[in-house]
Design a protein with these regions (language model features):
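Catalytic-site signature of metal-activated, phosphate-bearing donor transferases
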Residues: 2-55, 142-143, 170-312
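Cell-envelope/extracellular polymer assembly enzymes that use nucleotide-activated donors
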Residues: 74-76
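Active-site beta-to-alpha loop of glycosyltransferases that engages the nucleotide-sugar donor
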Residues: 79-93, 109
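Short, acidic, metal-binding catalytic loop of nucleotide-sugar glycosyltransferases
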Residues: 93-102
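Short hydrophobic alpha-helical runs that function as membrane-insertion/retention elements
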Residues: 102-107, 129-131
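Active-site-proximal specificity loops/subdomain of glycosyltransferases
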Residues: 112-161, 169-170
């Protein structure tokens, strides 16, 4: 059900525990990490069991407010990062500039890999970014998404689930709060944003310039996307990075039109959408090869999906 490269029950018995603690982590933080991992597994397992038995019925909490009268929204995103130090500051700054309140960044780097702390130090001090340690673990994207939602659903009106190469683009250039604070979303429990995919744009090697400047020409084919889900929903189970919530009835597109139960992953793309996600999936050939080698929170290193894309 839940595949982890490191079994939590065996974690304390690792021979290199002292090396790991000595490198960056003291005993208190190490214990805190174990607590996070145990909580992550429990939340995911409980929701998974409910969904498997057909007993899961997501519903808005009794604390629900009248969203048509709400004037200010609190919005956050949950993201997982691995070997993203070249891009993380641009990602964080972008979302800060469009008015996001918080980024929950799950550090999924290798145990002795790079750290986000120095690069994001100012954002961490300002509490715009909170880093959660899940270093060294694999196949944890979906458990993390469920954990992040359950831990924060009562703090935010909307929570997005995005990778670090996904940038929500609002055509009107209005802030993300103004965008969501619109009556078109009053009945929406989830807002699904289509990807607009950007490939290498005929660039081969990495350049020290922003992604938004380097890659400006989207591909002609677009499918898939990511979602923002309304907070305060009880018993919400997230089964994949694209489908946010089993039995959620009111999934909307960027215009507030309800698109569920249609196959919204493939059929919801709008040529005249008012907002979408710029997905810088491959970047340059050099960067994509690096992506294949590193793996991520969902796919292991050298996963066949990566190689198929590279060969095509």
């Amino acid at each position: 059900m839940l595949l982890l490269s490191i079994k939590i029950n065996e974690y304390k018995n690792f021979k290199f525990e002292k090396l790991y603690i000595h490198s960056r982590i003291d005993q208190n933080i190490f214990t805190e990490k174990l607590n996070i991992e145990n909580s992550l597994i429990k939340i995911y397992s409980d929701l998974y069991d409910l969904a498997r038995k057909g007993n899961i019925k997501p519903k808005i909490s009794k604390k629900n407010v009248d969203y048509s009268k709400k004037k200010n929204y609190n919005i956050s995103i949950c993201s997982i990062g691995k070997n993203e130090n070249l891009y993380i500051k641009e990602f964080v700054e972008y979302y800060k500039n469009i008015g996001l309140d918080k980024i929950y960044l799950f550090d999924n780097n290798d145990l002795e890999g790079e750290y986000f702390d120095k690069i994001l130090n100012n954002y961490i001090k300002d509490k715009f970014v909170e880093i959660i340690d899940v270093r060294g673990l694999s196949s944890i994207q979906i458990p993390i998404y469920n954990y992040c939602y359950q831990k924060n659903k009562d703090k935010y009106d909307w929570i997005g689930f995005l990778d670090l190469d996904e940038y929500l683009y609002i055509k009107s250039n209005e802030s993300i709060k103004i965008f969501f604070n619109n009556k078109r979303f009053d009945k929406c429990q989830t807002v699904f944003f289509n990807w607009v995919i950007f490939n290498d744009n005929d660039l081969i090697q990495y350049e020290n310039r922003p992604l938004l400047d380097r890659f400006t020409k989207p591909t002609l084919k677009h499918s898939g996307g990511k979602s923002f889900v309304r907070g305060n929903i009880n018993n919400l189970f997230i089964p994949s990075s694209h489908i946010i919530g089993i039995n959620i009835k009111h999934i909307c597109n960027s215009k507030g039109k309800i698109i569920y139960p249609k196959n919204y992953l493939m059929n919801a793309f709008e040529k005249n959408s008012i907002a979408y996600i710029k997905h810088f999936y491959s970047k340059t050939v050099e960067e994509f090869c690096h992506k294949i080698n590193k793996g991520n929170a969902h796919f292991h290193r050298n996963h066949p999906q990566y190689k198929n894309i590279l060969n095509n």
